[in-house]
Amino acid sequence: MDLTTEAEAFGAEIAFSDEAVPAVVGHCLSNADDIDKLVVPSLSQGRIPAYLKANLLAARSITDRPVFAGCIGPYSLAGRLYDMSELMVLIYENPDAAHQLLSKCTMFIKKYCQALRQTGVGGVMMAEPAAGLLSDGDCKTFSSDYVRYIVDEVQSDDFLVILHNCGNTGHCTKAMVSTGAAAYHFGNKCQMEEVIRDIPPTALAMGNIDPVSVFKDGTPALMRQTVFNLLDKMKDYPNFVLSSGCDTPPHTPSANVDAFFEALDDYNQQ
């Protein structure tokens, strides 16, 4: 996922590369005064219109499987605007300023998700990896409460919010669940058979094949064994959905991706 699109709309400088996903250069906010002056941008800024058009075209042309959009979460966006290390300090030294920034980020993400819903996609995967740096209590206060607001505003029977937090090692799952999202997506650093115990049976738990050591650097044989091992552990949970633990990196061999789906099909036919 491109987690710079929303930051660019706020005015952040973005570096592009043929070998990696776009990245924010520096940070566009330095203090509480900058936060106070920060204007929530319109959806005409940066690459937002291009992404909305892409989602519209995908929803119209892909009809044999669900189509989901992507967006960043409020805490992760705030970190890209203010600098992640500085934000970790701000939430303790000046929580009011942090909440002001998070509120502005949330307002923009809500507008963006509402526009994504209008394209006809079936939902949005909200990437909030930076919230995994926080304790469960801080995650709820500075991330999940804001995500909950967005979920309440945009989620419906035909538009699901999937909350992704690959920074969660199992320590902030309860905070994630407090958002009320329809599905929760986990990274490879947690144990799926443990975190799913905190997930309501009415919500999906998704994950968590290692995107680097298995998808990119592994072999089809390793992929097959890893998928079978995970599915064995999760066989008693009908709300589990097999997935990668995060974005698959550039240059991931297509043979490994094919092996992922083939292993799933073969396991289900046993």
What are these regions (language model features)?
Residues 21-24, 42-270:
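Active-site loop segments of alpha/beta catalytic cores
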